[in-house]
A protein has these predicted regions:
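Conserved catalytic core of the tyrosine transesterase superfamily
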Residues: 1-294
Length: 294
């Protein structure tokens, strides 16, 4: 386990990913009778079936477990033969929940305080992931270039996101009140320690409380605002490549899901029924009685 931790750290994996991977491997080790470095294909297939069948875990959770085991056997133990025995389960495409711009305004307006309000505005205006927002530093805000820098985003990649004038105004108001020193959103309950970032749980609570106060019945999470950011940009005319860069997607295919969510793109597509001329005979029966065909 220590070798795996060292390899994860060496490869600059996020702290949350390291914790999740080690936890998944620990569970696997407790499940199998064989020493972990002597595990064979049958053990892996049995565990895979156990996760999906007996425990009935969500597919995403099973994928995380498979990722952890692949890392252990392929990257740490150098057993590349294990790759075929650790297939990813097939995932269904589930369209994420999207709020209308009006609902987003309601949500932000229902924030408990200025701290929460600024968090919600930043999430929606930048499309940041929850962990990325937590790690934001005051120095990452470039008001001269009107850009927000995301350092070491998912996959360890830096990127920049345009900074809106409205968000900059909100951040300035927030800065005058909070006076953050290092992290833009400092942690602890009373937000007094500038050397620690806010926890992801606090971000989730800020969104959850605002959802309840706004009377929104949809299931809203911090990631919902990321989906709203991308979908509303697409509906405003932004191209997929630009959205991909702002979201930090390594693959354009991950961004194409928003085509399914954009009303503008769906409604702009000509319906085939509109393209044909249907004859309308004068003697078309108008009776409500249905007759069986002869």
């Amino acid at each position: 386990m220590e070798r795996m931790r060292e390899e994860l750290v060496r490869r600059n994996y996020a702290t949350t990913t390291i914790h999740s991977y080690l936890k998944a491997v620990e569970h696997f080790r407790n499940h199998v009778d064989t020493p972990i470095d002597e595990v064979g294909p049958d053990d892996l297939r049995s565990y895979h079936a156990y996760l999906l069948g007996t425990r009935k875990l969500a597919v995403n959770t099973v994928v995380l477990n498979i990722c952890a085991l692949r890392f252990l056997y392929i990257k740490v133990l150098k057993r590349r033969d294990m790759k075929e025995d650790l297939p990813y389960p097939k995932q269904r495409l589930r369209l994420p929940v999207i709020l209308s711009p009006g609902e987003v305004a309601q949500l932000i307006g229902a924030a408990r305080n200025l701290y929460h309000r600024t968090i919600l505005m930043t999430l929606y205006s930048t499309g940041l992931r929850r962990a990325e927002l937590c790690r934001l530093k005051v120095a990452d805000i470039d008001s001269k270039r009107m850009m927000l820098r995301v350092v070491q985003g998912k996959g360890g990649i830096d990127r920049e996101v345009p900074l809106s004038q409205k968000l900059l105004g909100a951040l300035r108001e927030y800065y005058r009140w909070m006076r953050p020193e290092t992290y833009l959103f400092p942690g602890t309950v009373n937000h007094s320690r500038a050397d620690k970032p806010i926890s992801e749980k606090i971000v989730w609570q800020a969104v959850h409380e605002a959802t309840i106060h706004a009377g929104i019945k949809k299931r809203v999470t911090p990631h919902t605002l990321r989906h709203c950011f991308a979908t509303h940009l697409l509906e405003s005319g932004a191209d997929l490549r630009s959205i991909q860069m702002m979201l930090g997607h390594s693959d354009l295919e991950a961004t194409t899901v928003y085509l399914h969510l954009s009303r503008r793109h769906l409604q702009a597509t000509a319906n085939p029924l509109e393209q044909i001329v249907i004859p309308n005979p004068a003697n078309l029966a108008l009776s409500r009685r249905l007759r069986k065909p002869q």
